[in-house]
Amino acid sequence: MSGTFNDIRRRKKEEGSPTAGITERHENKSLSSIDKREQTLKPQLESCCPLATPFERRLQTLAVAWHTSSFVLFSIFTLFAISTPALWVLAIPYMIYFFFDRSPATGEVVNRYSLRFRSLPIWKWYCDYFPISLIKTVNLKPTFTLSKNKRVNEKNYKIRLWPTKYSINLKSNSTIDYRNQECTGPTYLFGYHPHGIGALGAFGAFATEGCNYSKIFPGIPISLMTLVTQFHIPLYRDYLLALGISSVSRKNALRTLSKNQSICIVVGGARESLLSSTNGTQLILNKRKGFIKLAIQTGNINLVPVFAFGEVDCYNVLSTKKDSVLGKMQLWFKENFGFTIPIFYARGLFNYDFGLLPFRAPINVVVGRPIYVEKKITNPPDDVVNHFHDLYIAELKRLYYENREKYGVPDAELKIVG
């Protein structure tokens, strides 16, 4: 970890803070003792967030801190509610509901999806932190065609704080009940690459309206899929469902698609998170054919590759060898718990040197061309699966190489390693 506190390249991407340039060395050798003492302190101060940080940037940092720690906070609150007799009148009925409700695994996310919740200001702050941008390369045919009086209506609000120079801009979107709309087009299965640490871009682009998803792809309601273990935390699972996030199990994915709700799957999974590196992009894709089978078993669906430039720049990941003790522990954890824990670091809440908050690295989520799967086949043969898998990889590579120079990685190669 000797490079932990010396990652100057990373720190230059941070904040654009007023402290930039604070470590410039004075060439004048006749410095006074006071100047020398100040110069000694400057490298230490560089890592701290300045008090002059704009209020809006503080809100962005808090939004990201909430997202990265929300599952822990919900867990703590649940334990507090269970251990507090005064709250049992609420905790007991909820826990009964929690044990019997199967919404995350039965496609019921369609009924729990809330555009109003996805449009809360916190998600705009979250996306502006990096920032995250959602870019479409072609227009996608809407699954639902909305009449003008059914379109998303946006209202803007401004709340003045004290002192008056601070204010919070709020946006509120009207809700749309797609269940009462006529389906006029295909559904979509978006494959998101690369996984990175936490798929931060996928959350901002497809689980919230922070990137204006409903305006960029109108009439295509979407559910981001994640590990079923995330729904084992009380309250947190309802929070995820309100954002349209659901379990990535095959049964749930098929049921969600059958209800004309498109889905987004982070294809590389837990194993790919171990490959996160700023030196290039490595994907786990050759053996990932389950999502292709889902599309064929659904029919009238488009496979759409999505590449997020900058996803792997949000954290520094310490590489481990497969034969090392740590590498074996990571693989064991993945095999037994369904996910793994990469060794990573970035910045903290009040400093830029070390912590678990991601860096402010731009994430450009570029959506490729759709690959239409017309015919529904309940048990697709291998040659059909391989055919669409090859088409998908070809489109993903085209998407990457046509856009890599535009988004700052002109020489980085795309490697499919597993």
Curated annotation (Swiss-Prot):
Keywords, sorted A to Z: Acyltransferase, Endoplasmic reticulum, Glycerol metabolism, Glycoprotein, Lipid biosynthesis, Lipid droplet, Lipid metabolism, Membrane, Phosphoprotein, Transferase, Transmembrane, Transmembrane helix
Principal location class: other
Cytoplasmic compartment segments: 1-71, 208-215, 311-418
GO molecular-function terms, A-Z: 2-acylglycerol O-acyltransferase activity; diacylglycerol O-acyltransferase activity
Domain of life of the organism encoding this protein: Eukaryota
Catalytic activity: an acyl-CoA + a 1,2-diacyl-sn-glycerol = a triacyl-sn-glycerol + CoA; a 2-acylglycerol + an acyl-CoA = a 1,2-diacylglycerol + CoA; 2-(9Z-octadecenoyl)-glycerol + (9Z)-octadecenoyl-CoA = 1,2-di-(9Z-octadecenoyl)-glycerol + CoA
Similarity section: Belongs to the diacylglycerol acyltransferase family.
Name of protein: Diacylglycerol O-acyltransferase 1
Protein's organism: Saccharomyces cerevisiae (strain ATCC 204508 / S288c) (Baker's yeast)
Lineage: Eukaryota, Fungi, Dikarya, Ascomycota, Saccharomycotina
Gene name of the encoded protein: DGA1
